[in-house]
Regions:
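Short, glycine/acidic-rich beta->alpha junctions
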Residues: 108, 127-130, 139-143, 229-231, ...
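Sec-dependent signal peptide hydrophobic core
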Residues: 9-16, 381
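Membrane-proximal, glycine/serine-rich, low-complexity loop/turn segments characteristic
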Residues: 2, 8, 17, 23-103, ...
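Extracytoplasmic gating/loop element in the C-terminal half of outer-membrane beta-barrel translocons
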Residues: 330-334, 733, 788-878, 883
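Gram-negative outer-membrane beta-barrel transporters
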Residues: 647-764, 775-778, 786-791, 795-797
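Extracellular/periplasmic, surface-exposed regions of secreted and cell-surface proteins
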Residues: 284-289, 293, 299-303, 312, ...
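Short aromatic-centered micro-motifs
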Residues: 104, 496, 744, 774
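Flexible glycine-rich, low-complexity coil/linker segments exposed to the extracellular/periplasmic environment
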Residues: 172, 176-222, 322-352, 399-445, ...
Length: 918
């Protein structure tokens, strides 16, 4: 346990117990107990926000972001390539709202997805209009995802207990060539490289026959490291109830995830098995202290540990590149296999013999809202104080050990009808025998947030006014230098409606970021929104629109605006034996244009309800001009004599349409529902600081954000004569079998001036989801699908499409799908020749490697049955069977289109669970 954890526990729990004791005898009903922590400012002139309540009840996800796939128009869940955590086996997921990373709020406090478990969530809202964004000033420009946790009710105690077991299997696991196939093809590649063969005929036969398993092994490294399934265990408990003056909700969630890796049992002095343990505890308390005073206290504690072997990098970085013939798992004498060429990369030894790494994380998140009704002074007036404090500590523990490995340097020669082998065993490394243990704090993190508000709400006949004035400050401090982030805001909002038919909101935010110099720190972010309910019956029609400004400091860093000086050349004072003094010189040029990104946003939409609102339709269009984007400009002349730092000069535009349709109906004991939603996103680069280009097609301006560029492949060189008669090639030596490119500018040279835009963007044009649910009496079924289209991915991101390069392996997956060029295969080759070299000519961005990355996935499907309480006497029970990520329709087929690189494999999981309601 961390040294300060006991103290923090006392600081948080003691006031909570005192409050509970003080109010236990109160019987007065407070009019303030309906405060919605997820909607404290109560803007009215917008559409019905995208809202979802039931998804976390039906979706047994280890990562709650999985449950959000396809549930909200415009919200994309994707692999977080920029959120890799080396302490975890799996890549985290990230949210993208209209191409940006939205601000995530939990009960009105800025937090992360890692801070909450699905069992705690009451509702999720996606706020996309300009007025909602302006409320959060310099943090609101990327949109807002607001999560509200469950709260207690004036009711007897209700208890739920749930257990689920998840059976995980790899989704499209790769297959790699066996030793003989590898040996045969590496000989072919070396021949095409103009190099001698690596294996003679007798050695190839040895690889095929397994006659000499230590000198010429055939190892399926994937099967040596992975088992055929992983196991997940999840247990959840909730407690809800209370009186009119004291209400509570508590939850306990435990998850143990045993990964696909095989058990590591080589040394009983440490545990090198891969597992992830998480324990989450939440307590939400609502207290009516007096008739005019209300308090909400939320406390979340999360303990997590991730354990793995003490290898230096992801084990997949070895599995995807190590040939099956490289070396055996172990030699005959028991030493681990390895070579002087590959070093100590034996993945089995790395997992079992290097020791253990255990990462522990403790989170304590606490926030409190105190609301005082001031109606005795001014009718409709109230005041809020909202305080949050988060403490996150990360501890690393290590057991370290080294291992010895060896190789057999062998030659097989033919002797008549038989063969003989000559071997020399070479040893490397040392077996440390002893295990050293150490531990250290990886990081300490503190977040503090303070919000104070004055609220005024009055009715004047048919007129209703709701106004707020607030001050907000946030502080995030991470151990290390220049790792803090601080903001301050003063904001106000006024909402008006007439007979709940016509609505108007005005928001003004004056917000500043500590990343900026003091004289340029604060900026104004105003917004206005209007709405009208045109039809308030059947049918129902509401139209709304908004326009305003908001900001984002997410890409800023400390000291970018400051001119720094770094060590320069030295100068000697004195004669022989004089003293050298280091000089100083200008570092990167200061970001003189530094300012937070500015979002100028406008939205317009409709909410439509038909057939007694069984059919609900929402359509919303938006336009955003995004300015002051931080980029590295290349259009600043080098005559200034220093390197150029990032500057806030970029500009992009984002336009799109979000559409959602839902139908829900009931006939007696049968109910059902259908839904579909989609978000279209059109982007354009307006300014990116690109230097002057000789040809218009080289400019990125006017193209979509994330547009793919590359050389246009027009064929494969068939012979040296064709190479000689072609334009000059500048990407390394070119041989028959290499890719042939179009000379776009006709200058007789193939170089970077011939890159053109091709295919589409890395950002999807359309993100969509659809699904259904049905129930008959105690039976329920559901299915959720999600997909994207209009997105381009590159096979260069997959190690399976880099066969044999730089002494790596070749995958059977690649061989089953493609035909490489070689003499005799020219007519039907789909890929360039095999090579053991780097081949910078072939393996660069070009039209051969880009592929359509569209897909449709079955994200969730499930069936459940509830056994009523009258049958069990004590409680009712629900048994369920659920599948996640079961299949994908796409053009890639050999891998998960969302994850082509060398990483822990995607998994499909089948869950079986039982839930008791007491």
């Amino acid at each position: 346990m961390y040294p300060n954890m006991k103290r923090i526990f006392v600081y948080i729990t003691l006031p909570l117990l005192l409050v509970c004791t003080a109010v236990s005898a109160q019987e007065t009903v407070s009019p303030l107990d309906s405060v919605d922590l997820g909607n404290l400012f109560r803007l009215q002139a917008n559409g019905n926000p995208d809202k979802c309540r039931a998804i976390f009840e039906k979706s047994p996800e280890v990562d709650i972001a999985n449950a959000l796939y396809g549930q909200f128009s415009g919200l994309l869940v994707e692999n977080g390539y920029d959120t890799y955590d080396s302490n975890q086996a799996k890549r985290k997921l990230a949210l993208r709202l209209h191409g940006h990373t939205p601000l995530l709020l939990v009960d009105g406090i800025s937090r992360s997805l890692d801070d909450i478990d699905g069992i705690e969530i009451d509702k999720v809202e996606v706020l996309k209009d300009a007025a909602a964004s302006a409320l959060y000033g310099v943090k609101g420009g990327d949109g807002v995802v607001s999560i509200t946790t469950k709260r207690g009710k004036d009711s007897p105690l209700k208890v739920t207990a749930k257990y689920q077991y998840g059976f995980a299997t790899p989704f499209r696991a790769p297959e790699f060539a066996d030793a003989y196939t590898y040996g045969f093809l590496v000989n072919e590649a070396r021949m095409l490289d103009g190099l001698p063969a690596k294996y003679n005929e007798a050695e190839l036969f040895a690889l095929y026959s397994g006659q000499y398993p230590y000198a010429y092994p055939n190892v399926n490294w994937w099967d040596e490291v992975y088992r055929d399934h992983g196991d997940n265990h999840q247990a959840e408990f909730t407690f809800m109830g209370g009186s009119r003056n004291f209400r509570y909700f508590a939850a306990v969630d435990y998850l143990k995830e045993d990964f696909l890796y095989k058990k590591a049992t080589a040394d009983d002095r440490y545990n090198a098995n891969h597992y992830d343990n998480r324990l989450g505890i939440r307590a939400n308390v609502d207290v009516n202290i007096t008739e005019s005073t209300m308090m909400k206290i939320n406390v979340k504690a999360r303990l997590a540990e991730f354990n793995r072997g003490n290898y230096s990098d992801r084990i997949e970085n070895t599995l995807y590149y190590l040939p099956s013939a490289a070396f055996p798992v172990k030699q005959a004498d028991g030493t681990y296999g390895g070579t002087s060429q590959y070093g100590a990369v034996n993945p089995v030894a790395q997992m079992q013999e290097r020791g253990q790494k255990l990462y522990s994380q403790t989170k304590v998140l606490a926030d409190m809202l105190l609301r005082q009704d001031l109606g005795v002074f001014v009718e409709g007036l109230s005041a809020d104080v909202n305080v949050a404090f988060d403490y996150i500590g990360r501890l690393s523990e290590e057991a370290k050990k080294e291992f010895r490995y060896s190789e057999l340097v062998s030659t097989v020669a033919a002797q008549g009808d038989s063969s003989y082998i000559l071997s020399d065993q070479l040893y490397y490394g040392t077996d440390s025998k002893t295990v050293s243990f150490s531990h250290w704090f990886s990081s300490l993190e503190m977040k503090m947030e303070l919000q104070t508000r004055l609220n005024w709400e009055r009715n004047f006949g048919a007129h209703h006014v709701d106004a707020h004035a607030a001050y907000r400050q946030r502080s995030w401090i991470l151990s290390g230098q220049n790792n803090s982030s601080k903001t301050q805001e003063i904001l106000g909002s006024v909402s008006y409606n007439w007979k709940k038919r016509f609505f108007a909101d005005v928001v003004v935010n004056y917000s500043g970021s500590a990343y900026m110099p003091k004289d340029k720190r604060f900026h104004w972010y105003p917004a206005v929104s209007l709405a009208a309910i045109v039809l308030d019956g059947d049918p129902y029609l509401k139209v709304y629109g908004s326009a305003g400004l908001s900001g984002s400091d997410g890409d800023l860093r400390h000291e970018l605006w400051r001119q720094n000086y770094v060590s320069g050349n030295s100068y000697y004072f004195g004669g022989n034996g004089g003293t050298s003094y280091s000089g100083r010189t200008e570092g990167d040029m200061a970001a003189v244009t530094l300012t937070p990104e500015l979002s100028r946003r406008a939205t317009f939409g409709i909410d439509l309800g038909l057939f007694r609102k069984r059919l609900a339709i929402n359509a919303e269009g938006f336009m955003e001009d995004r300015r002051n984007i931080l980029i590295y400009p290349s259009n600043i002349s080098e005559v200034i004599g220093v390197d150029v730092n990032e500057q806030s000069i970029g500009e992009n535009t984002y336009k799109g349409i979000d559409l959602s349709v839902a139908w829900n109906d009931r006939h007696g004991d049968f109910d059902y529902g259908l839904y579909a939603n989609g978000g279209w996103l059109f982007t354009k680069v307006i300014e990116d600081g690109q230097a002057y280009q000789m040809y218009d097609y080289l400019y990125r301006k006017g193209n979509p954000v994330g547009q793919c560029y590359g050389l246009e492949v027009i064929g494969i060189f068939q012979n040296q004569m064709e190479i000689n008669n072609s334009p000059q090639q500048t990407f390394g030596a070119v041989l028959p079998g290499d890719l042939k490119y179009r000379d776009q500018n006709g200058d007789g040279i193939i170089d970077s001036q011939d890159r053109v835009k091709m295919f589409g963007s890395y950002k999807p044009l359309l993100n969509f989801g659809f699904g259904l649910h049905a129930g008959y009496k105690n039976f329920k079924v559901y299915a959720d699908f999600q997909g994207v289209t209009g997105v381009t991915i590159s096979l260069l991101g997959s190690p399976l499409y880099s066969p044999l390069r730089s002494s790596t392996t070749i995958s059977q997956t690649f061989l089953d799908r493609e035909v490489t060029w070689a003499p005799g295969r020219e007519a039907y080759a789909t890929m360039p020749r095999l090579t053991t070299q780097e081949s910078s000519n072939n393996y660069r961005d070009n039209s051969l490697w880009y592929r359509d990355g569209s897909f449709i996935k079955l994200r969730n499907v499930g069936i459940s049955y509830t056994i009523p309480k009258k049958a069990l006497k004590l409680c009712d029970a629900t048994v369920s069977l659920t599948g996640t990520n079961l299949f994908s329709l796409d053009n890639i087929r050999f891998a998960d289109p969302e994850q082509l690189d060398a990483y822990y494999p995607s998994t499909r999981v089948v869950w079986a669970g039982v839930k008791f309601n007491f």
